[in-house]
Amino acid sequence: HLVIDDYAVYRHPELGIEVAREFDRPPTELERIAYKVEERDYRGTFYFFQMAEATPAGGEFIGFHGAGGGGSMMSMDAVLAKGFKLANFCDTSGNPPASKVYRAAKIILSQPGIRGYFASGSGVASQEQYNSARGLVKAFIEEKLDIPAVIRLGGNFEVEAIRILETYGLGLPGRIEGYGRDDSPEFCAGRLEALVRERGNAGYAVRPIPPFVEPEGAYAFATVTGKLFIRRDACAACKTKGCIEACGPKILKLEDGAPVLAISAEEARKGKCTECLACEIFCRFHERDAISIHLPIPGLAEYRAGIVSVMEESHINGHL
């Protein structure tokens, strides 16, 4: 009997293990994309399992985003009891960085036709929930989320997490509601049901992912899984320099009135930059929108392009 650690599989391509998960079927393309996110990033857990590849609009399917096994099971029971169907199961636990939660949300929102987004776990998670909130906010903004999202983030710093969700998600077409440990999965499932019914039968339309273009002339440094850009010319008009304070690990400093690394680029790349997304969100909403963090998801743009093509073809055929 031989056991291979999930995080060691990538070191042994000779074993032919494509996805280190105990599936009872070959992995779907979206599951392959999700696993590549998890494969080499040891920080926290990201598990994604697609429960329905076909999620037609009006079919009561929702995207499910859990945190921890037991709490996720209770939360799934709660939404199933309201008549919803699960397009997927997802778990981001073990104190993942905001960047991993962001990627999880982007992958969940690559399923056309879902009518809502439901995130709920144990309610007492021992992880910094503001990281989850920032990851969700970044994904929801990029997606211009237009379906309701009910997010239950019970655990450490849940009050701050709920504030982040409800403050920075206000301008989106879809309504976002944040809840904590005192709100039961059943109550939160009821809120999702009410919001979905209020919106009507329209399902989520998956959007293409535009090619990323690096900001010209920006100050930049690599992070563990991405790259951060600062348009220093825009920083001249910044009044607060609040990104310095917002940065949790305190790796930024001011130089000539603009933020730069206070550590070496190598230290940032190896993990001193935790990809918490705090500087980007602060600058976007409170200052000059001069900071952006690019977090690529290999294969997702191509996957979505295929979905969009099928949707457009179906729309054309429906009008013939």
Describe the role of every protein-language-model region:
Residues 111-138:
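Cofactor-cradling patches in redox/metallo enzymes
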Residues 209-227, 243-264:
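Short, charged low-complexity linear segments at domain edges
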Residues 208-227, 292-320:
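Iron-sulfur (Fe-S) cluster-binding modules
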Residues 94-97, 123-128, 154-158, 185:
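Short, small-residue-enriched loops and turns at beta-alpha junctions
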Residues 263-286, 306-320:
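Short Fe-S-cluster ligation motifs
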Residues 240-261, 278-298:
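Iron-sulfur cluster-binding cysteine motifs and their immediate structural context
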Residues 1-116, 141, 161-162, 166-170, ...:
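ATP-dependent carboxylate/acyl-activation modules
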Residues 146-153:
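Short internal beta-strands
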